[in-house]
Amino acid sequence: MAKDKTNDMTVGNPVSLIIRFMIPMCLGNVFQQFYNIADSIVAGQFLGVDALAAIGSTGSLMFFVTGWLNGLSSGFAILVSQWFGAKQYDKMRHYVAMSIYLAAAFAIVMTIGLEALNEPILRLMNSPEDLMGSVKGYMGIIYAGLLVTAAYNSLAAFLRALGDSRSPLYFLIISAVINVFLDILFIVKIGMGVEGCAYATVIAQAISAVCCLIYIIKKFPILHLKKENFEVSFTSFRYLLALGIPMGLQFSITAIGTIIVQGAVNIYGSVYMAGFSAAGKIQNIIVTVFVAFGATMATYVGQNRGAGKMDRVKEGMRYTQIMILIWSVITMIIMFFFGKYMTWLFIDKSQTDVINVSVTYFHTVFWAYPFLGSIFLYRNGLQGLGYGLVPMLGGVFELVARSAIVMFVAGKTSFAGVCLADPAAWIAALIPLIPYYIYVMKKWSRGKKETAA
């Protein structure tokens, strides 16, 4: 029965497997982005620029919080994918159970801590006083729903670890539609304001999590856990945390950098906040292809590493790099020439000052998309191989680069100077990633030759 729903990526044509897995991942990422985008569209159209700025200014903070949980879940799922690739299903189920313990614990602790620090964090980000009430209320509701976020991330990660990228997509589509309906209901009909967007997001994510759980129960007997699977093993916790924490920190370190940039943008006022927010949301949609390729490689590399098929790892990485470069060129053209028109989704055409801010961002960063795409490839490839520290180090390089640019230009030069923080960060992140990947593959090749000799 398991063969009907799982996807063994250790056999078959690598390119075909990667593309078939990547497409649902990409669509899933689009709908994941749609949660916050739907909030921004409804808020911007019905509540005005200040509401759009309030929600938009939380983007980097939400990425910090949800990125940490997503990184943890993705790290835990790598061990699940490796044991699945090795056909050691009892060990796989054990690590699923231990992952559930850890994800729940982290979500609960984060909820308590972030609720207590809600306002101090927003003040550190230079959130304008006139928006403080709206932003604080919005994030407070998001924090209260972190257990739901952790549940969905974990369940979806388990499905992807076993090669199923389609089912999480279907659940996201359903919940995204519900999210839009609830946004309109809470804001337009009931008049709940910005907080209505947050309630809609949490409820929609809860629906995704429930759908995932029901689907696993009905269609994935290989993931049915028994009492013995839940026997606590601190050794297993250590193995999971060795991958989960670096991946969570990598997301969070990257998010800290974007929070620093957001704080710099906030200095320029609500017009720049709104324009930067719209540009960021559009860019997030466009680069979901990069994110999908990266997540695909984590599963592909993890399964093949577990099966000991390192030749397939190298082959898959090489072909994926080519596909990423092709999409980078397409993305550069789209953002440079058509980015302005895409902002109309969030901003009224008459608000030319806000639109010009978005266009300035696009024209400043578009040339660096090949570097951004490569980050996802090498970061996730190394993580799939079981190396968590170097990808985290790449995040540190990102943070240093962003911080340095902001330190020297924020409030001292034009907005375009702040925008350069992103390309600088993308290039810096690759400094440890590519050399270490080359080192790992050469080390494996030498070991193979020595064994053959």
Feature map (PLM): residue ranges:
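Hydrophobic transmembrane alpha-helices of multi-pass small-molecule transporters
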Residues: 64-67, 111, 179-184, 209-213, ...
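Small-residue-rich hydrophobic transmembrane alpha-helices
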Residues: 52-112, 149-168, 276-339, 372-394
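Short alpha-helical transmembrane segments in multi-pass integral membrane proteins
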Residues: 1-22, 80-145, 189-245, 301-368, ...
